[in-house]
Amino acid sequence: MKPMVLTVPAKKEWVLVLRMAAAGVSALYDLPVDVLEDLRTAIEESCELLLHQDYTAETLTLKCEARKDGLHVCLSAMERTCCCAEEPADADIARLILQPLVKEVELEQDESGVHCVHMTMPARG
């Protein structure tokens, strides 16, 4: 199956759409309900992190792809412009929140902050 890619405006009200899309992908890959709930929570936490950095993003892009070792999920802030309007979210705290929810987590960052969250959910059954 091809990867699922969804791009939405980088606004808090669109996080629900990303959570629902991730839940749908989880159902397609027959992941257990507890994994589905962990993924939805991880998506929400990742969005919170990406929406509170030293930049303003125009869009958030969610990519989900099934692999042998599990469901790979990438959430990226796209079309970023610098702005220091608020205190950025702490990447270390975000990682601590995400680690118990997912099999693996990696945060991509540069001088303006975290711009991509890579996660792997456990393989089904």
Predicted regions and their residues:
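Conserved beta-strand-loop-beta-strand hairpin that lines the nucleotide-binding pocket
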Residues: M1-M4, L49-G125
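Bergerat-fold GHKL ATPase/HATPase_c domain
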Residues: M1-T41, C84-A85
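Conserved ATP-binding N-box helix of the HATPase_c
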Residues: P32-T56
